[in-house]
Amino acid sequence: MAVISMKQLLEAGVHFGHQTRRWNPKMKTYIFGARNGIYIIDLQRTVRLFHTAYQFVTQTVGSGEHVLFVGTKQQARDTIAEEAQRCGMYYINQRWLGGMLTNFKTIKLRVDRLKELDAMVEDGSINRFPKKEILQLMGEREKLEKNLGGIKNMARLPGALYVVDTQRENIAVLEANRLGIPVVAIVDTNCDPDLINYPIPGNDDAIRAIRLITSKVADACAEGRRRLEETEQADHDKEFTALEEVPAGQILKDEASGPIVEIVNPVAEAEEEQ
């Protein structure tokens, strides 16, 4: 079953590109034609390329990596936050701070400061300060939360970026390119697809189009997380079964001249005492 259908794409208006005077020639291969001065995107290409992107995202998250959702334009902000939270990923939906990837250590210091302020509010220690200073600290916390709240728990660089509007988020894309972080993105008719590892040709301005594609990318993340959990559970069960099968009193000796270790099965030992 296809992860996204032509009908869904048409209903969401994903096929509408920009005006014909605003386009990037590199997008020519993804354009079906023009109507009333508007480019029409070839949705057959969109379906195929989205399937490829979906598989990549699923595999990335399934291997233990995270995807950073990026979309700061007004039409994308709510969707980016909602869908990233739904699938347990990180997001930036207000402002991309330069160096967020390439200077991650410095950004991490600001995130640590946000956590420090959160802790002060939670335990009430912020109330020890004068009223004026409390207002300053709360203002600092609000600003940090607005810009960095979506990556508060991101301990390391993401395994991939998902971007809405690569023109607007060009700094994010270039930083990812520089670090070799794969980018999945909606590419409208005015975008440069060469900068994107997994382009999804489509309308990056309409709210319905953004929501449809972003929700499907979030579905891919959720599927990847399920696969990861299943793999981890299977590995755990395998280790537990192997431990149970070790005969009581079996002696294992390392090939090196280390100590001899006796593996004792406590269940079997208890049965013998009875």
From Swiss-Prot:
Keywords: Ribonucleoprotein, Ribosomal protein
Name of the gene: rpsB
Disulfide bonds: none
Keyword Ribosomal protein belongs to the record: yes
One CC-aspect GO term: cytosolic small ribosomal subunit
Molecular function terms, GO-annotated: structural constituent of ribosome
HAMAP family: Ribosomal_uS2_B (MF_00291_B)
Highest taxon of source: Bacteria
SUPFAM superfamilies assigned to the protein according to its UniProt record, in alphabetical order: Ribosomal protein S2
Family statement: Belongs to the universal ribosomal protein uS2 family.
GO BP terms, alphabetized: translation
Protein name, as recorded: Small ribosomal subunit protein uS2
UniProt organism field: Syntrophobacter fumaroxidans (strain DSM 10017 / MPOB)
